[in-house]
A protein has these predicted regions:
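N-terminal pre-catalytic "stem/leader" segment of glycosyltransferase-like enzymes
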Residues: 1-33
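A charged, aromatic-enriched C-terminal amphipathic alpha-helix characteristic of glycosyltransferases
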Residues: 3-6, 267-308
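Donor nucleotide-sugar binding/catalytic pocket of nucleotide-sugar-dependent glycosyltransferases
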Residues: 64-78, 83-100
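Conserved donor-binding/catalytic core segment of Leloir-type glycosyltransferases
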Residues: 106-124, 129-132, 136, 145
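Nucleotide-activated donor-binding/catalytic signature segment of Leloir-type glycosyltransferases, i.e.
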Residues: 159-184
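Acidic donor-binding loop of glycosyltransferase active sites
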Residues: 191-205, 218
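Short hydrophobic beta-strand element within catalytic cores of glycosyltransferases
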Residues: 219-222, 229
Length: 322
């Protein structure tokens, strides 16, 4: 399952199946609407995605509430479809915090610095692999683990265009290609990973991979592209996005090299930063917190009539401009 499916499955497991007796919570892809329930559209896609075009021409009125997974995403949908702000809200994606002793992880002597990439290949793997290959010419004590496949969505054929890249990883002594594995296995691997290397080139509306890496205490290298800056909240090794892929790769090389030096120094300041990063991710992206926020949201919608009527909310006062 991909991120959207994982979020939906987790949400229902946290709130309980009974919530679906009253609410129709639709994760991104609308197939049919249940007029007998309160309808909540939970968007994970980009506004330009064809699956979102049903919101055109007032299509957003079919939903009692439209939920977005980042403020970046919310504002783009509002601009694209003219949706009123008060018809929407933001509920960040969430994770179960990764249980790892950062003092032990930080101070343990290792034979190599472990880099990891654990998202689909089209998001930046083609930039990462040649950069890492070049780094290996100068640094022998580094290793890259790649967990990347469209099989996570059941789209096996889409892997074919990246097969040459996968082969390059498999044939490199300092890289390991793991393909598709269950999310729990990735989280276990993150406990021993040092760097989440993510030269992202695809606009993310949210990034669960980054949340997990932050929780695992990994040094995270990525651009400030789309919603990544919002997810990172200034805790990571973030850089300004570069459209030119060649320039991007060269800049990312420097960031990767810097991370090697920083990790080898084992400075107290880095340790404090990574601990703060983990604390932030564990608190702010925690399912225990998000479950309560979702529960409060749904309770606030319970009174709404199933057929969506024109807003007749009684105003407390009249605000006059000028």
């Amino acid at each position: 399952m991909g991120g959207t499916e994982l979020m939906m499955e987790k949400l229902i497991s946290e709130l309980g199946e009974d919530v679906l007796k009253t609410f129709q919570i639709i994760p991104s892809r609308v197939r049919e609407l249940d007029e007998n329930k309160i309808r909540v559209l939970w968007c994970h896609d980009l506004p330009q995605d064809p699956e979102s075009h049903h919101l055109k021409n007032g299509g957003w009125r079919n939903f009692h509430k439209i939920v977005f997974c980042s403020h970046w995403q919310q504002q783009r949908y509002l601009e694209e479809y003219g949706i009123p702000w008060d018809r929407t809200c933001v509920m960040k994606n969430a994770i179960d915090p990764i249980d790892v002793d950062l003092d032990k992880k930080f101070n343990t002597e290792k034979d190599s610095i472990r880099f990891v990439y654990h998202t689909t290949p089209h998001r930046g793997l083609a930039l990462l692999v040649p950069v890492f290959d070049k780094l290996c010419e100068q640094y022998t004590n580094i290793h890259l683990d790649v967990f990347s496949s469209f099989k996570i969505y059941g789209w096996d054929k889409r892997d074919e265009q990246f097969q040459e890249l996968f082969d390059q990883i498999e044939n490199h002594e300092n890289m390991t290609y793991h393909g598709f594995v269950p999310n729990q296995e990735i989280k276990e691997h993150l406990k021993n990973a040092d760097v989440f290397a993510y030269p992202n080139i695809w606009p993310e509306t949210s990034c669960i991979s980054l949340m997990e890496a932050m929780s695992a205490g990994c040094l995270c290298i990525h651009p400030n592209y789309a919603a990544l800056y919002e997810t990172a909240s200034n805790w990571t090794f973030m850089y300004n996005y570069i459209e030119d892929y060649n320039k991007h790769a060269n800049f990312f090389y420097n960031m990767m090299e810097q991370s090697i030096h920083v990790l080898n120094e084992k400075s107290d300041s880095l340790k404090i930063k990574l601990k703060g990063q983990k604390s932030y991710a564990d608190l702010y992206y925690n399912w225990e917190v998000r479950k309560n926020e979702w529960s409060d949201l749904l309770k606030s919608l319970e009174h709404l009539p199933r057929p969506i009527e024109k807003d007749t909310t009684e105003e407390i006062f009249t605000y006059k401009v000028g």
